[in-house]
């Protein structure tokens, strides 16, 4: 076949364009994870294994669950069995590892392009995955100083800055890996705009008049300073009774709780049995929160975890603030606020849990 010069040029341009598209799909890019590591990943990622539940939650909200080919074995324990409703795929996905261990054969069977891990994943685990030729991206949702990035209970000069900037960094990192940058920015913008509305309503409350709050976990464990939980309380207008003497996540004694005498006690939704234990145990009856029936089970979105989640900032802090200062939030329908968030980022309706204190 004879081609004229213009036809030949067009054919060459078409061929080169196809080659460029082909090579671009195989090209690499370098990102920096939240351990400060330079990680080279494919230009287009659509097969990831997620061995950290916070990152799995973010991927669902970024509308990237279809890119997930494997998840951690404890995801139901960490996120709650109700989390499965956000995608029918969740209950069918392989589970080649967990927060601190991996089955390398099972992992390789899923052919992932990237594996997400927690910042405290053992170095041996990271090395094992990387030696198999798979890039590892660590997520902490904190902005830490040098030498603190891989710690579960890091030293922090400024908790507010560490978690606020760290959450934004983490969302942007995860969104960048799975090519969902616009969704990541939308999630950040909405989260912090909603939080600011709560801040404005509570800004005139003096520290000395803040409600004394205790976060009750099983076996008398609680969160002190250095965790997002304390910041959640602060932004909701509370004073965390454990913050002054406890760092991180630790067990305390009933005598210590009695001495703190919290006015309100919160329990995370994943520990519903703790509510009746506290309400019915004679040892707790002299505490103000129990006497005044201010012991509340939190809804699933009010994640008072050590690590921040966007829904906790956007609507969880609002829920907590409304419980602590109802007169300041009489115009707020918390279920509507929750539904707005769920429709926007989970693409489903918020259904109040029958056991949680959602009103």
Language model segments and positions:
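A short, structured surface patch at a secondary-structure boundary
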Residues: 50, 56-108, 114, 137-142, ...
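Extracytoplasmic substrate-binding proteins
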Residues: 38, 125, 130-217, 221, ...
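Bacterial N-terminal signal peptides that target proteins for export
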Residues: 2-13
């Amino acid at each position: 076949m004879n081609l004229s010069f213009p036809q030949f040029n067009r054919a060459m341009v078409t061929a080169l364009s196809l080659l460029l598209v082909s090579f671009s799909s195989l090209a690499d890019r370098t990102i920096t994870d939240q351990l400060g590591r330079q990680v080279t990943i494919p230009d287009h990622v659509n097969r990831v294994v997620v061995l950290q539940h916070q990152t799995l939650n973010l991927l669902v909200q970024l509308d990237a669950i279809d890119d997930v080919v494997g998840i951690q074995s404890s995801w139901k324990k960490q996120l709650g069995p109700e989390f499965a409703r956000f995608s029918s795929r969740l209950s069918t996905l392989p589970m080649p590892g967990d927060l601190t261990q991996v089955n390398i054969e099972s992992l390789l069977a899923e052919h992932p392009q990237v594996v997400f891990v927690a910042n405290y994943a053992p170095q041996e685990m990271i090395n094992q995955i990387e030696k198999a030729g798979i890039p590892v991206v660590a997520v902490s949702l904190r902005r830490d100083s040098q030498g603190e990035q891989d710690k579960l209970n890091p030293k922090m000069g400024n908790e507010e800055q560490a978690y606020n900037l760290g959450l934004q960094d983490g969302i942007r990192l995860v969104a960048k890996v799975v090519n969902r940058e616009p969704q990541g920015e939308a999630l950040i913008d909405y989260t912090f705009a909603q939080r600011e509305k709560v801040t404005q309503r509570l800004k005139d409350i003096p520290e000395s008049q803040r409600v004394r709050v205790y976060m009750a976990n099983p076996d008398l464990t609680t969160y002190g300073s250095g965790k997002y939980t304390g910041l959640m309380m602060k932004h909701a207008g509370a004073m965390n009774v454990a913050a002054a003497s406890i760092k991180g996540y630790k067990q305390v004694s009933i005598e210590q709780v009695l001495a703190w005498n919290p006015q309100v006690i919160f329990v995370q939704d994943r520990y519903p049995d703790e509510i009746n234990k506290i309400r019915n145990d004679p040892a707790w009856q002299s505490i103000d929160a129990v006497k005044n029936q201010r012991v509340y089970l939190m809804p699933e979105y009010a994640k008072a975890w050590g690590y921040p989640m966007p829904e906790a900032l956007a609507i969880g802090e609002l829920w907590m603030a409304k419980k602590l200062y109802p007169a300041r939030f009489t115009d707020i329908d918390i279920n509507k606020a929750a539904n707005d968030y769920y429709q926007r980022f989970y693409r489903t309706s918020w259904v109040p849990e029958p056991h949680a204190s959602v009103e």
